[in-house]
Amino acid sequence: MSRQLSRTDNLIHQFDTILRTLVPHAATASRANPAAGTQDKAMSDAERRHAAGLMRINHTGEVCAQALYQGQGLTAKLHETRDQMEQAAAEEIDHLAWCDERLRELDSRTSYLNPAFYAASFGMGALAGKLGDNISLGFVAATEEQVGRHLDDHMHKLPMGDRRSRAVLEQMRTDEAHHERWALEAGGARFPAPLKLGMRLMSKVMTKSVYTL
């Protein structure tokens, strides 16, 4: 059972999470990098730039996921599922660190737009939390489903020689599927198709802009 945190403890924790999420190279993974021991094959400069664009999108997706969990943490009750929510958020920090590390290996960087997407996702998470735990958990499930779609698409689009990025994305895909399943089993509402379509359209704005910026 988690220790009950004071208001000051919560503020410190929130600020620390913001820093680890938005400051480049600040996130530290609690698990080993899935790409450890995996070697890339030869890639052209164009392939490396393409791989970096995809990994930048994935990194920003994890920034959004972390903001979602943090926003919900401020407003949702989640008495029965807070431990699982905190575990999922910790795994998203792992994903942030792995994507950041891979971007550096590809001689690239994280997106300049991360603060804006963080703020938007934080607000949506806080609003979802206010609407009740079933909506909050349903939003987690729908978001993780969307992230999973991106990961599947990116694993298909990665250059054949980029084995290290693929290893990272495969582990992330496993984690995201687990988060989605947990949120639904915990009572999350299944969002209707029109709402999911709206989320996909918003996601396209992110992917188009972050690929280069």
Curated annotation (Swiss-Prot):
EC number of this enzyme:
1.14.99.60
Spell out the subcellular localization from the entry.
Cell membrane
Q: Which residues bind Fe cation 1?
A: E62, E92, H95, E176
What coarse category fits the chief subcellular location reported for this protein? membrane
Sorted alphabetically, the keyword list is: Cell membrane, Iron, Membrane, Metal-binding, Monooxygenase, Oxidoreductase, Ubiquinone biosynthesis
Q: Which CDD domains match?
A: DMQH (cd01042)
In the bilayer, the protein is annotated as:
Peripheral membrane protein
Involved pathway(s): Cofactor biosynthesis; ubiquinone biosynthesis
The disulfide bridges present are: none
Example GO CC term: the record gives:
plasma membrane
Single Gene Ontology MF annotation: metal ion binding
Q: Which reaction does it catalyse?
A: a 5-methoxy-2-methyl-3-(all-trans-polyprenyl)benzene-1,4-diol + AH2 + O2 = a 3-demethylubiquinol + A + H2O
- Which cofactors must be present for this protein to function? Fe cation
Task: Please list the coiled coil stretches.
Answer: none
Q: How is the cofactor bound?
A: Binds 2 iron ions per subunit.
Listed GO biological process terms = ubiquinone biosynthetic process
> Where does this protein hold Fe cation 2?
E92, E144, E176, H179
User: SUPFAM superfamilies, from UniProt?
Assistant: Ferritin-like (SSF47240)
Q: Function of this protein?
A: Catalyzes the hydroxylation of 2-nonaprenyl-3-methyl-6-methoxy-1,4-benzoquinol during ubiquinone biosynthesis.
Q: Which NCBIfam families match?
A: DMQ_monoox_COQ7
Q: Which family does it belong to?
A: Belongs to the COQ7 family.
Protein's UniProt name: 3-demethoxyubiquinol 3-hydroxylase
Which source organism does the UniProt entry give?
Answer: Chromohalobacter salexigens (strain ATCC BAA-138 / DSM 3043 / CIP 106854 / NCIMB 13768 / 1H11)
Organism lineage: Bacteria, Pseudomonadati, Pseudomonadota, Gammaproteobacteria, Oceanospirillales
